């Protein structure tokens, strides 16, 4: 059975990103193709901000997601509208808005809600973390 993970809680004000990470690790270790993709929406898109740096004595959630995604070839999608609104932009969006920099972390990609719908329609279950 394949799952889609939908994460909506802020990485800084909720346990949503951490709980989703723990679930994803366990699921992928048990069955490497059990998760088709992770879609971050609302404040959860802040996980993909390359400029955010956690204190050294805290878990680096962004880095943990990047490592997991790399290890299992897991797509990490950020809702483009929510991300741009919160200042998380890739190089092409930076040019579009005539900015000199971008802030999207490696391993994350900006996608529209159509990608979420596609994930939902192609997996057996969607699990939301808020």
Please state what every model-predicted region is.
Residues 54-84:
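A glycine-rich helix N-cap at a beta->alpha junction
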Residues 45-48, 84-86:
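Short, active-site-adjacent cap segments at secondary-structure transitions
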Residues 4-20, 48-53:
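Short, glycine-rich nucleotide/cofactor-binding loops
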Residues 6-8, 39-41, 80, 128-130:
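Short beta-strand segments
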Residues 24, 36-42, 75-82:
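Short internal beta-strands
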Residues 16-33, 38:
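Histidine-anchored nucleotide/phosphate-binding helix
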Residues 80-130:
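N-terminal glycine-rich phosphate/adenylate-binding segment common to multiple enzyme folds
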């Amino acid at each position: 059975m394949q799952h889609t993970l939908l994460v909506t809680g802020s990485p800084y004000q909720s346990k949503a990103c951490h709980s989703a990470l723990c679930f994803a690790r366990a699921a992928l270790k048990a069955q490497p193709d059990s998760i088709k993709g992770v879609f971050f929406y609302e404040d959860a898109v802040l996980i993909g901000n390359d400029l955010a740096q956690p204190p050294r004595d805290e878990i680096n959630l962004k880095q943990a997601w990047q490592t997991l995604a790399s290890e299992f070839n897991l797509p990490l999608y950020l809702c483009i509208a929510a991300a741009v609104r919160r200042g998380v932009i890739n190089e092409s969006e930076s040019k579009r808005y005539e900015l000199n920099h971008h802030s999207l972390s490696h391993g994350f990609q900006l996608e529209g809600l159509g990608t979420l719908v596609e994930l939902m329609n192609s997996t057996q279950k969607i699990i939301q973390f808020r």
